[in-house]
Amino acid sequence: MKTISKYILLAAVSLSFTSCKKFLDREPIAQITPDNIFNSQQGAQSAVMGMYRTQLGANSYGQSLIIVPEFSARHVNHVSSFPEYVDFKTNTIRIDNPWVQNIWTAGYAAINAANNIVVKVAAMPEAAIATDKRQQFIREAQFIRALTYFNLVRAFGEVPLIVTPTGENDNLKVPRNTVAEVYAKIIADLIEASNLPNVYANIAETKGRVTGNAAKALLAKVYLYNGAVTNTYAEAARLAKDVIATSGASMPVDFGSVWTTKNTSESIFELQFDAQATNPLATVSNPNASALFYAEGKSIADLYEAGDKRRDFTIYQNTPADPRFYIGKYRIFNPAIQNVPVIRIAEIYLIHAEAQARLDGGVSAASYDSYKKVRDRAGITTPDISTFTTLAAFITAVQKEKRKEMMFEGEAWFDYCRTGLALTDMMTKADPNYYLYPVPDAERRNNPTLTQNKGY
């Protein structure tokens, strides 16, 4: 594994001072050093904001974590059909694929930023930081660490589980941990993060920050993904139901407003982009400039039923003369300050629908109502509950609904791999080995203890 320098944290902290005015007053950047970041509460808070900024880059939610799985799901194209993108669609990913490397490297950079906070904030003297802020900062870092490991374990399977800070001179030779070990740490971190406040001092402080409800929502998703192995569907259903009932989140009538308006009632955790930290994916989705990515056309449109309000927002043609369809969820280009909703209530309804059905052994009124809620917002009629004669039929319907609801959000590929639906509905090579991406070759050269995934 490539070593992750403490200067990654310092760079992120410096950016947080220039662009996170809502969270803290700025300190002269020249006064920030790796040694003094954790000497004061303000310094620790700046490290937390820097950690959030690790999620915004082109190798994270600013592009890779969304667009790469969408290539795997065969939802998008690249204007030049570069092999490093096309290989995801054809399940022929090379071990030196740069986007696989980028996801791995950016993931461990974010984890290192979180580890620094968890370990070093815990070690700060009592006089340097208030007790409530110490707990808050650590729990925020635990959430980001859990979110990042969840993304990595879905992409690569077994990954090294590193929970202490690493420095520029560290020569790590860390083997891969089992999937079960990684999930256990994700769950432990999220259980602790669920103790975060649901509302901070004011709205400005709450926007973009992890809350207790965000941790519970992500934990429900984690339990759903891990449920086939650990039978945690009851926990997934319970947490999803709790978030639906108590978070105050709701689905706006206008589906498109979730992306054209920042921090709507639908959002549970939303990454904040601004003029200093613009959204790379929105920038390269602009059909009036140099769009790099565009949507598959008819194959995507045909997934939606007649009258589905989501279709014409999710994909669109820029002009009648332009045959391409574009990604509608990232259309705020000038400037590209569009936020990214990482967790939203519509997904939680669908998590509840599936988990509750699995728990009940078949579709029930509770699971059906959650499924119907999402379809009602889309303006389409839901088949009668009696039409779902088997559990499998209902789960497939829920997953297909999630695919339409969360198109171009980086979710459908992982969700379909989770149940095997990807084999028939997405994959060019119907081989479960290719549910996972290859461990980057550069990482294996640097760290010979890393094994490669089957099929690569």
Describe each region flagged by the PLM.
Residues 34-35, 62-81, 162, 198-283, ...:
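Short, surface-exposed recognition loops and adjoining beta-strand edges that mediate ligand/DNA contacts
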Residues 45, 53, 83-156, 194-202, ...:
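Conserved, well-structured interaction surfaces
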Residues 3, 20-67, 93-96, 424-456:
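Membrane-proximal, proline-rich intrinsically disordered regions
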Residues 86, 235-345, 420, 437-441, ...:
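Hydrophobic-face positions in mid-chain alpha helices that act as interaction patches
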Residues 1-19:
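Sec-dependent bacterial lipoprotein signal peptides
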Residues 185, 280-282, 293-295, 314, ...:
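Long, intrinsically disordered, low-complexity segments
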